[in-house]
């Protein structure tokens, strides 16, 4: 068992590489989880984040074995690669306080088939959802999203349908969807508010 006492921060790399850890419950007293704090905890399957958490450092839970993830509403800062290479995450819930998805935040997933970007998100970073092998449907909600980074959905080979609700097309890079939909007959389909508004996507 791990007891954190009255601490408000879990230091960088504190539990990195601890392959015996299977379950982690972060108490509400913790506000910040440092860089690579649980990086490489390959058997960590169950994570409960306390409502006090506001900041997750770079690669905080990278290379773990998580099966589900729910971000509390107080989380406002998500470090680069915070949950990268957690291929078994089957359910992903974004908190209401998150406005930006960092680079490589959730890269590599082999379980989720449908992803909805909530209306609170303004930017999607480079490589943030790259290598999602089962993703078939992407929904971008609301009117807040302004940009999608390079290779954000790279190699989502089964991505057949992208539903984009914003009336103004978010800025995309030439490779934001590189390799996406390549295994779909007829390739992927963009369902958008206006063909003219989204001309930059084609």
Question: What function would you assign to each model-found segment?
Answer:
Residues 37, 60, 82, 105, ...:
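Generic detector of bulky aromatic hydrophobic side chains
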Residues 174-181, 197-202:
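Short, aromatic/basic amphipathic alpha-helical patches
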Residues 1-9, 19-32, 42-55, 64-77, ...:
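Structural signature of tandem-repeat unit edges
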Residues 11-14, 34-39, 57-60, 79-82, ...:
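Consensus positions within tandem repeat domains that build extended binding/scaffold surfaces
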């Amino acid at each position: 068992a791990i007891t954190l006492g009255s601490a408000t921060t879990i230091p960088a790399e504190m539990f990195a590489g601890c392959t015996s850890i299977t379950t982690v419950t972060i108490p509400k007293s913790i506000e910040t989880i440092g860089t690579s704090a649980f990086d490489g905890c390959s058997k960590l399957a169950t994570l409960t984040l306390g409502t006090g958490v506001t900041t997750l450092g770079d690669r905080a839970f990278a290379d773990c074995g998580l099966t589900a993830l729910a971000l509390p509403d107080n989380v406002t800062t998500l470090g680069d690669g915070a949950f990268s290479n957690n291929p078994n995450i089957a359910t992903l819930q974004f908190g209401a306080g998150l406005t930006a998805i960092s680079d490589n935040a959730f890269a590599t997933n082999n379980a989720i088939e449908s992803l909805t970007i909530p209306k609170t998100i303004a930017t999607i970073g480079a490589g943030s959802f790259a290598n999602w092998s089962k993703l078939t449907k992407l929904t971008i909600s609301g009117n807040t999203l302004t940009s999608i980074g390079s290779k954000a959905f790279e190699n989502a080979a089964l991505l057949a349908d992208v539903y984009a609700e914003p009336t103004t097309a978010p800025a995309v890079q030439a490779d934001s969807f590189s390799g996406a939909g390549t295994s779909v007959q007829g390739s992927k389909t963009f369902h958008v508010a206006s063909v003219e508004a989204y001309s930059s996507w084609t």
